[in-house]
Design a protein with these regions (language model features):
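Short, solvent-exposed loop/turn elements at domain surfaces
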Residues: 29-36
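Short, flexible beta-strand-to-coil junctions
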Residues: 26, 110-113, 148-153
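Short, exposed beta-strand-loop hairpins at the edges of beta-sheets
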Residues: 144-160
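Short, flexible N-terminal segments of the mature chain
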Residues: 37-55
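Residues that flank catalytic or metal-binding motifs in active/ligand-binding sites
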Residues: 18, 24, 68-70, 76, ...
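N-terminal helix-cap/turn-to-beta initiation motif at the start of protein domains
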Residues: 2-23
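Contiguous, well-ordered beta-strand patches that form the walls/edges
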Residues: 51-142
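Short, low-complexity, Pro/Ser/Thr/Gly-rich segments in the mature regions of secreted, periplasmic
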Residues: 162-172
Length: 172
């Protein structure tokens, strides 16, 4: 273990050795829930099959193909990469920018995260909306990373406003 002299929450995000790979949580790992209210996708959780269907039939997100079973690696230098697509970008975090009783900080990225499309309820289903570059960090500890973003770009945020959630666990 290297000593980076960083707060524990940062080490939880990027790993004790300066690099950490996150993969999808075991269940309810991508979907919709409420801003300031839900800890994850409480309203709608997409399956791998639904995520794959989105990438197959929605040309705006077909570059995310394969990411429904992929992973994302973050490092101490602020770089991230997504497998299996190989997309790379940079990230910054701010653990002082919180939503009381709901989020522990914010994450900003220069490229889409793992399966980085937001979704919104449309009719009787859900559909991709935009590729967020700023996320609420709803939970970050050694075993969980939960990110959320407004379901639609530019939407007003108020309690229970629709948010897309991404839920990760460390890759073994």
């Amino acid at each position: 273990v290297k000593d980076f002299n960083l707060p524990q929450i940062v080490l939880d995000l990027i790993g004790e050795d300066g690099e950490k790979t996150w993969t999808w949580a075991d269940q309810s790992f991508f979907g919709l829930g409420g801003y300031e209210a839900d800890p994850g996708p409480a309203w709608f959780a997409a399956s791998v099959e639904i995520m794959d269907m989105f990438t197959l039939y929605m040309p705006t997100i077909n570059h995310l193909t394969g990411e429904s079973t992929g992973s994302m690696t973050l490092d101490i230098d602020g770089n991230f990469s997504v497998a299996p697509t190989g997309r790379t970008g940079t990230f910054t975090y701010d653990f002082d920018d919180i939503v009381p009783n709901w989020s522990v900080g914010k994450l900003k990225v220069t490229a889409p995260i793992l399966y980085g499309t937001a979704i919104a309820l449309v009719g009787e289903g859900a559909a991709p909306t935009y590729l967020p570059t700023e996320f609420f960090i709803v939970k970050c500890d050694a075993n969980n990373l939960v990110l959320a973003a407004p379901a639609e770009e530019g939407q007003a945020l108020y309690p229970w406003a629709a948010c897309t959630f991404w839920c990760f666990k460390p890759k073994p």
